[in-house]
Amino acid sequence: TGKILITADQINFGYTSSCLWKSPLNIQVRSGDRIHITGNNGSGKTTLVKLLLGELKPAAGTITRADFSYLYIDQECSVLDPGLTVFEQTERFNASHLAEHELKSILNRYLFPYETWDKPCFCLSGGEKIRLLFCCLMIGNNAPDVFILDEPTNNLDIQSVEIITAAIKSYRGTVLLISHDHY
């Protein structure tokens, strides 16, 4: 088992005077954990993640956090710059200074053929954005300690789901996956 990143003890939260969860929550997140947070709309999945990251304060209980880096990937993939083209986006993440042909090879692996390289990112579908983001993170080779993925497979076809699933499986850090799905 890995280093303890977050310990939440008897936490609860309320936007009003009532608490969000019927019973207080106890959670421990360790380095390398794969945690799948499921629930219906309004059940508090995103609120829980915001509490764990320190973006919200609990109404009850305590949360202790180690020092770690994280990347929250929302459904809009707002980490991407919508004004750049697909290829320009990969160049932006190219901290390893890969050659142009290597970038193009990686783009192809993530289902971005030549004819998509000049496409502006604001024109991409939700599935294309998440694929491009994972492609860029592979190119950047500077993954955070924790990935938080909010509904990463929404609007994806089966081939895209397989690519994203493989990328998540190959990632060695901690993954917090928020979804309605029980997969």
Features from the language model and the residues they span:
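ABC ATP-binding cassette signature C-motif
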Residues: 2-183
